[in-house]
């Protein structure tokens, strides 16, 4: 009886000193006390709606924005995208950093203490959006739609038979690569994929290492880049790689602009070593008005819109990780800092 009363008293005191956080199918018990200081360090966009949503989901936390924030010493969690390198040394209490996107290449992880966790956003809707974009542009190249757009501007009414090319090669076989491969396969395309490490898949012919890449490139009709950006993948789409593709091949880059050596692509197109390209990402964004890509009829340009993050999905993931951090739980979607993804 005495033990039961003591247990009840303990539970009462614990619940008085805690709050419940419910997230979809999970319930967290979080100790009340000083609020956690969260810094939004995202440059190049208006963060008003993002911060308002975070405050709605995390009413007990202190949500601040860089560079207006004056209490950097208190910051424990940072939501970052292209944050300045000199920010990290001003955060002595930093415990975790979340990228605002699927990749973490905008975070200079070499400047973070080793004990700081880095996480990223994983959004199934984003993966489906990417798959639809890739399928759409593969079909556009197959059906010669860009040629018809040009002919329309010239009042040129002349039909051409669609290409028979049907083999897509994907660089990168993570969540986005797998979603694209599935969508392409369901629509009748043959799909191969290359990744740094060996993987297996029943419907996709997988390659790995440099030898595997060399074997895959001559066999494909469309090359889709979905790699994470690391020191090893920067500039991977260069003159050497492009020379290994068939002359009728098309390149679709939806990963990062730095994967592509831009002048090498222009040279390959101008010399007819490559048929066409779709580019959604660029070394400099927005793409400068005087960039030669704008005036190349063989290049289709979109403004980094292949897969746009959904505000509700992103903020829910961020809020969940902040509450997991407060509860002492392992964060979701942690990044291997050695690999960079």
PLM regions and their residue ranges:
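N-terminal glycine-/charge-rich "phosphate-binding" loop or analogous flexible N-terminal tail
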Residues: 1-2, 7-76
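Short acidic low-complexity segments
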Residues: 63-74, 85-88, 204-220
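Phosphate/diphosphate ligand-binding glycine-rich loop within oxidoreductases
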Residues: 76-149
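C-terminal helix-to-coil terminal segments
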Residues: 120-121, 125-130, 147, 285-341
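A charged, well-structured terminal subsegment
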Residues: 137-160, 313, 318, 324
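Glycine-rich NAD(P)-binding loop of Rossmann-like domains
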Residues: 147-179, 206-207
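NAD(P)-binding Rossmann-fold cofactor-contacting core
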Residues: 187-203
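Rossmann-like adenosine-cofactor binding region
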Residues: 198-292
